């Protein structure tokens, strides 16, 4: 299962479509903010194989969520891919320093997003 965390319903839907286009059989859950995502992770969602995390969200931003995940013994080993519209190198550096497993910049065309996610899945969720 993959957890998509983004405050934009459109971006969540795009991520789901792009994941489906990779050809992998994957279940997807979503959360519209960081607090909801952490609650889902800590209260019975089950551990996802991968988290796609938006960086710029109201309330608890992606970096704060990522730090919470990395500081939680039960969650810290989950690969977290930051997916953000920020083109700033300082944001990439901050995400990596906070523990991001990978970093994708949006907006991407659907075919490009699917290709990028396919690479991410291959790297973090190899087919067995």
Cite the ranges covered by each PLM segment:
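Active-site residues of response regulator receiver
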Residues: 53-54, 84
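Conserved acidic segment of CheY-like receiver
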Residues: 1-19, 51
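Short, glycine/charged-rich "phosphate-handling" switch motifs in NTP-dependent
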Residues: 101
């Amino acid at each position: 299962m993959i957890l998509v965390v983004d405050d934009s319903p459109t971006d969540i839907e795009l991520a789901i479509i792009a994941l489906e286009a990779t050809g992998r059989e994957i279940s997807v859950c979503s959360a519209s903010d960081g607090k909801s995502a952490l609650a889902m992770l800590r209260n019975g969602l089950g551990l996802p194989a991968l988290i796609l995390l938006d960086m710029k969200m109201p309330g608890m931003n992606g970096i704060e969520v990522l730090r919470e995940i990395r500081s939680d013994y039960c969650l810290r080993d989950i690969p977290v891919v930051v997916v953000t519209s920020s083109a700033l190198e300082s944001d990439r550096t901050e995400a990596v320093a906070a523990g991001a497993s990978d970093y994708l910049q949006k907006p991407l065309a659907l075919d490009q997003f699917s290709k990028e996610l396919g690479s991410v899945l291959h790297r973090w969720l190899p087919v067995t």
